């Protein structure tokens, strides 16, 4: 199992406050990695969990989202990564395009059958990233949210 950092929060000095950009960051969907088409028919099992709450499942590649942070003026206590406001805050992060490209590159090069994404409690960041991966790139993936 290889663990990859999603993002180093020490670089996130500017942060993001929901409403500043009116939620209109235009993510350009990637179609190729290293001149090869992205396999959007790829079937992947994606697991999400919270490192402080759950035992990690066995995965081929694991992405650590504990240091990834976004800011929003919405109270997220009653929300989770399935909610659009959480996913929009991830997409509107100033480094989203770079981060998603790194994740897709790892998947396309290493051809994992299972990937994991974890954050602290398994409710917001890991769930949001997994849902975005499925919605934007790997529609046939199956997601298991251990923390929900």
Regions found by a protein language model. Give the residues of each.
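Catalytic cysteine-centered active loop of the rhodanese-like fold, especially the PTP/DSP P-loop
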Residues: 103-138
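C-terminal accessory "lid"/substrate-recognition subdomains
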Residues: 21, 30-113
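Acidic, low-complexity, intrinsically disordered interaction modules
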Residues: 10-11, 15-29
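Short beta-strand-centered segment that lines the nucleotide-binding/catalytic pocket of NTP-utilizing
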Residues: 142-148
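Conserved beta-strand segments of alpha/beta enzyme cores
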Residues: 45, 140-142
């Amino acid at each position: 199992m290889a663990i990859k950092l999603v993002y180093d929060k020490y670089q996130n000095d500017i942060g993001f406050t929901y409403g500043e950009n009116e939620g209109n960051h235009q993510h350009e969907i990637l179609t190729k990695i290293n001149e090869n088409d992205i396999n959007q028919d790829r079937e992947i099992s994606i697991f999400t969990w919270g490192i402080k709450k759950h035992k990690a499942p066995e995965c081929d590649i694991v992405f650590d989202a504990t240091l990834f942070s976004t800011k929003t003026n919405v109270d997220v206590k009653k929300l989770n990564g399935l909610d659009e406001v959480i996913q929009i805050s991830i997409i509107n992060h100033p480094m989203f395009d770079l981060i998603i490209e790194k994740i897709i590159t790892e998947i396309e090069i290493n051809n994992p059958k299972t990937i994991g994404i974890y954050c602290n409690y398994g409710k917001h960041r890991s769930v949001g990233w997994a849902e975005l991966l499925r919605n934007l790139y790997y529609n046939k993936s199956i997601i298991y949210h251990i923390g929900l």
